[in-house]
């Protein structure tokens, strides 16, 4: 284990006790385990799967999951401080972990500060409990592929990836580029446009945020990924072709995102 000093000295940066503890935990696990594997991931352009197993065993996969669901309850600042320590030793893990944690922050800290009526709030709480259980108990990894090569991610147009509503769920069709964790995440947290019929015009007002199981029929990964310094993120192209998902794979309430 490296005996490196913390990036953010607790007394100088006036860290809270929670921030100090999480920074210590991430520094210890990254300096003792991640650093020795980092070169291999970059050389092979392979995903840091072993590091995620260590994060799960160290109770860090739920770093930003609310405490009442069994998580560590870190806010954005606390997570950023802790993740900085991971980045010192394995950039690929820090970058991809950010995608996973962002899903937890959106459904957790962000959602808790949005206005919802009681019905939507109860629905969201019930659904996110299921997603959080997957993460905490199974170590499930949630990716966050948004990019499509158009203006949608900037909020200038509707997402080209669509979710056709059916009686039992949605049928997803579309493509995401630069999709980090492709082929390695358990669930893809996808932004898409809900359609109520095949002839419905796409609208930004109908943006959906849903989880697509990576092993679901119709999901595939294409293309190469070989950029300098980011090979381990495995940000290839995701294709969704008539992929069915049930309603409980919703990550954020409809009309809220």
What are these regions (language model features)?
Residues 241-257:
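A glycine-rich, basic-preceded beta-loop-alpha segment at the flavin cofactor/substrate interface
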Residues 1-18:
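Intrinsic disorder at enzyme termini
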Residues 22-29, 46-62:
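N-terminal glycine-rich anion-binding loops that anchor highly charged ligand groups
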Residues 175-221:
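A short core secondary-structure module
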Residues 30-39:
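N-terminal capping segment at the start of a domain
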Residues 49, 56, 63-176, 180:
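Glycine-rich flavin
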Residues 140-142, 159, 186-188, 208, ...:
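Structural beta-strand/beta-sheet cores of well-ordered domains, especially the beta-sheet scaffolds
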Residues 217-244:
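Flexible, small-/acidic-enriched active-site or ligand-binding loops
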